[in-house]
Amino acid sequence: MIEKRNIFLVGPMGAGKSTIGRQLAQQLSMEFFDSDKEIERCTGADISWIFDLEGEQGFRYREEILINQLTEKKGIVLATGGGSIKSKETRNVLSARGVVIYLETSIEKQLIRTQRDKKRPLLQSVGQCPQFFQTLAKERNPLYEEIADIIIPTEDHSFKIVAKKIIHLLEKP
């Protein structure tokens, strides 16, 4: 059986962090948190409203504080926001307090998975622009890789299969 260590999922929007995170938590009998949902719960406001009011910098500050608090818990699965790794402090905290799993996916798959999502603030202004996703990937992928203990492609498999693969990898000594 897997010891109850924290599992932190990082990766771009549309990689499946929330869906896979819920499945992992359920299968491993762990508590699940989604940093975006927790910010909304704590503030009573949705993320796009926070972005409108405080800008990305204000949102990232809130996110950094929340992730620091959540990662102090034991035995959790945490799905982080795609841009959370922009903060050096957040990268350090994630690396130090659990197993970081980078859910990797292609820009094409991101476009498909996010096409109907109206709740992502960064997509509100640019829509489904491949160049936007390419810019984010160029900026963020090296940061995901920097802190990843495990890299899992989510491209060609169902999220259920990806969750099973992660559990299998975590069970290895």
From Swiss-Prot:
Q: Kindly list the positions annotated as binding ATP.
A: 14-19, 120
Annotated protein name in UniProt: Shikimate kinase 1
* TM regions (residue ranges): none
Cofactor note (record): Binds 1 Mg(2+) ion per subunit.
Q: What PROSITE patterns has UniProt attached to this entry?
A: SHIKIMATE_KINASE (PS01128)
Cofactor(s) needed for function: Mg(2+)
Gene Ontology CC terms, in alphabetical order: cytosol
Q: What does this protein do?
A: Catalyzes the specific phosphorylation of the 3-hydroxyl group of shikimic acid using ATP as a cosubstrate.
Q: Which HAMAP family match?
A: Shikimate_kinase
Q: What is this enzyme's EC?
A: 2.7.1.71
Tagged with keyword Electron transport: no
Q: Which GO terms describe its biological process?
A: amino acid biosynthetic process; aromatic amino acid family biosynthetic process; chorismate biosynthetic process
What catalytic reaction does the record list?
shikimate + ATP = 3-phosphoshikimate + ADP + H(+)
Q: Which gene encodes it?
A: aroK
Keyword annotations of the record: Amino-acid biosynthesis, Aromatic amino acid biosynthesis, ATP-binding, Cytoplasm, Kinase, Magnesium, Metal-binding, Nucleotide-binding, Transferase
Q: Which cysteines are joined by disulfide bonds?
A: none
Q: Where does the UniProt entry say this protein principally localizes?
A: cytoplasm
The record ties this protein, via NCBIfam families, to: PRK05057.1
Q: Which InterPro entries match?
A: P-loop_NTPase, Shikimate/glucono_kinase, Shikimate_kinase/TSH1, Shikimate_kinase_CS
The record's family statement is: Belongs to the shikimate kinase family.
Q: In which pathway does it act?
A: Metabolic intermediate biosynthesis; chorismate biosynthesis; chorismate from D-erythrose 4-phosphate and phosphoenolpyruvate: step 5/7
Q: Where in the cell is it found?
A: Cytoplasm
Q: Which Pfam families does the record associate with it? A: SKI
GO MF annotations, alphabetized:
ATP binding; magnesium ion binding; shikimate kinase activity
Source domain of life = Bacteria
Q: Extract the signal peptide range.
A: none
